[in-house]
From Swiss-Prot:
Protein name, UniProt field: Aspartic protease 3
SUPFAM superfamilies in alphabetical order: Acid proteases
Taxonomic path: Eukaryota, Sar, Alveolata, Apicomplexa, Conoidasida
EC number: 3.4.23.-
Catalytic-site annotation from UniProt: 299, 490
Comp. bias regions, Low complexity: 87-99
Keyword Signal: yes
Region (Disordered): 87-116
One record GO biological process: protein autoprocessing
Length: 643
């Protein structure tokens, strides 16, 4: 699937749409938004799901100063966070070490007290994560826990991707096509676990029905449809495909004819999607000696590391910053050489694998393997992954089991240095064209409302955790007792998704209607969508999940995508439709506890925006071109603005 081979996580190849679509939210065009390997698999199977009778907890706000003082004796002064969502002022600072390969230091930042979590834990009865040795709730273990608010080691500013205006229009049109085709033509779209690029969600080239997706306008013929499973070593005696590249090996997903074991059937009503990758945010990494800075996407839905090389002289390659191996004193080609040859219906992408030193903030990762794109498009520019999205690379942050090359992922190499306070990273997605942030080694309490609830990863491949229920308003929408359901937190896609059996019901309950932004009460006609995970409610208000189409229609930023497998029904939570509103944490197993994902309400305010803008200005290799920024138009309704 997947074409996109490089430059950006799953390229928009196939559902690029999907992802794209998500991107749409980035909105493009029109989103409405208010002003070593895990060793904890043994814990995963033991995680129990919430009883249908158990009442979910309301999403908690901040504790008062008096509560904190009385329960923890903390002398730190913390101002209560008002309902407007302003961040607390906290004294104290922690400086991150400077990059060893740049004269510019990584900007230090202020950190908050862990007493907030301790106090909340004491008052709620939910244990702090470091006290949980078991997540087998049925046998007295933890079902969820509270993050201890360990301050991060450093933050990386993240910027909106280029050409957003064009990109948002295309992704929004794909969202509309998804709704129209699903509802009017009764077509269901699906992806398979481990069949996309880098082991991400998608389908392999040659899967029956892929052409139909293109016919529906859902898989753009201008984007590649190849899979990284097509890596070939042309310089060795074995020129065959690398076996099981980037795939999960479960019997239920190993054979496409046997995967649809839920309500979906492989028939004329089912259409495979090549891939769903699409991000609206890029960060910064340095490659080589001296470091050459590029701006890749950071993707929790894949694992591999790819950049665009200087040998790629196609027009679309020259639009982005390319890495020049000849200018690096430390670059060396893989030995034996590995040639990457990814073919798709109307073109191809070629490249090689190399080894070089990478700079990620203050960390210097020596001898990192990565893919280098050297040619794409062939004799035909159809399928060119750079034609629509100007990714300069992709940094996969998922689990090592997803690696398509068998090499150690860059994040695992950072962990192996032993310098992170916690083996975790966290995303803060800002609104519009403002600067976002990726934190390594901990969290920054200014960017979220405590506490951060942490939930065990149910299977250490994707960042996924069990889903208890979804409510539309006060009506339970999902999930039936006895069924398996889970959410995947995916920073590489923008929209949220629902299975085929659910999206139609959602659109019946939340039909598209003409946007009336002159009426401040307009969104009062729409219900809140609430996810219940581990007994905790995470609501999305209409201002957060609605997008506005070119026809001035307000519609939910949800796509229909089935992910059939024996693991249950998958609900993807994307970077713009969910992660923009919630600060998300991704913690790897420490060998005694499972990997965890954490969620807390994000705090968006002028102070945070100004701070991150300053970080961006001082960060090595970070920059935003004026032509890359999306123009924002002021809206009449004070509670909404178009992104």
């Amino acid at each position: 699937m997947e074409g996109r081979t490089t430059a950006g996580r799953a390229t928009p190849a196939g559902f690029w749409l999907f992802s794209c679509c998500l991107a749409s939210v980035l909105w493009s065009a029109n989103a409405l938004i208010p002003a070593g390997k895990s060793a904890g698999s043994s814990f995963l199977a033991a995680t129990s799901s919430q009883s249908s009778e158990e009442a979910p907890r309301e999403f908690p706000g901040h504790l008062s100063n008096s509560q904190i003082a009385s329960e923890t004796g903390s002398a730190l002064k913390i101002e209560e966070i008002a309902s407007s969502g302003s961040a607390p002022e906290v004294s104290g600072a922690a400086g991150a070490s400077a990059s060893k390969t740049s004269e510019k230091p990584i900007r230090p930042y202020h950190t908050g007290p862990s007493s907030r979590s301790s106090a909340y834990s004491a008052s709620s009865g939910i244990p702090l994560c470091h006290t949980c040795s078991s997540f087998d709730a049925a046998n007295g273990g933890c079902r969820l826990c509270v993050h201890g608010e360990v301050a991060s080691d450093f933050l990386m500013p993240m910027m909106p991707i280029r050409n957003i205006d064009t990109h948002r229009e295309e992704t929004l049109s794909r969202l509309e096509a998804n709704h129209r085709t699903h509802l009017n033509e009764k077509k269901n779209f699906y992806v398979l676990r481990g069949k996309g690029p880098f082991g991400s969600l998608g389908n392999l080239p040659g899967t029956p029905g892929l052409d139909a997706a293109i016919a529906f306008g859902l898989s753009s013929p201008d984007l590649p449809s190849a899979s990284f499973a097509q890596i070939k070593n042309k310089d060795s005696s074995d020129s065959g495909d690398v076996a099981a590249v980037g795939e999960e090996t479960d019997s239920a997903v190993a054979d496409g004819s046997k995967t649809l074991d839920l309500d979906l059937k492989l028939a004329e009503t089912s259409v495979p999607i090549l891939q769903m990758k699409d991000s609206q945010y890029v960060g910064v990494i340095g490659i080589g000696t001296p470091p050459q800075f590029v701006q890749p996407i950071f993707d929790t839905g894949s694992t591999n590391l790819w950049v665009v090389g200087s040998k790629c002289t196609d027009d679309t390659c020259t639009k982005v910053t390319r890495f020049d191996p000849s200018a690096s004193k430390t670059f060396r080609a893989a030995n034996p050489p590995v040639h990457l040859d990814i073919t798709f219906g109307t073109g191809r992408i070629e490249g090689s694998t190399g080894i070089d030193d990478f700079t990620v903030g203050p960390f210097l990762v020596k001898g990192q393997s990565f893919g280098l794109v050297e040619s794409e498009g062939g004799h035909n520019m159809h399928g060119n992954i750079f034609k629509t999205i100007n990714f300069e690379g992709i940094v996969g942050l998922a689990f090592p089991e997803m690696s398509s090359t068998g090499t150690v992922p860059i994040y695992d190499n950072i962990i192996s240095q032993g310098t992170l306070k916690e083996n975790e990273f966290a995303f803060y997605m800002a609104k519009g064209s403002q600067v976002s942030a990726l934190f390594f080694g901990g969290v920054d309490p200014r960017f979220y409302e405590a506490p951060i609830h942490m939930f065990p990863v149910t299977r250490e491949h994707y960042w996924e955790t069990s889903l208890d229920a979804i409510y539309i308003g006060d009506k339970k929408f999902c999930c039936e007792e006895g069924t398996k359901n889970y959410v995947i937190l995916d920073s590489g896609t923008s929209f949220n998704t629902m299975p085929s059996g659910e999206l139609g019901k959602l659109l019946d309950m939340i039909p598209s209607k003409e946007c009336n932004l002159d009426d401040p009460e307009f969104t009062s006609d729409f219900p809140t969508i609430t996810y219940v995970i581990g007994g905790v409610k995470f609501p999305l208000t209409p201002e957060q999940y609605l997008v506005r189409s070119k026809k001035n229609e307000c519609k939910p930023a949800y796509m229909q995508i089935d992910v059939p497998s024996q693991f249950g029904h998958a609900y993807i939570l994307g970077s713009v439709a969910f992660m923009r509103h919630y600060y998300t944490v991704f913690r790897r197993s420490d060998g005694t506890r499972p990997s965890l994902v954490g969620i807390a309400r994000a705090v968006h305010n002028d102070d945070n925006s100004a701070y991150l803008s300053n970080v961006l200005n001082e960060y090595p290799g970070a920059h935003i071109r004026k032509e890359d920024l999306m123009m924002e138009r002021s809206m009449s309704a004070p509670s909404m603005r178009e992104l």
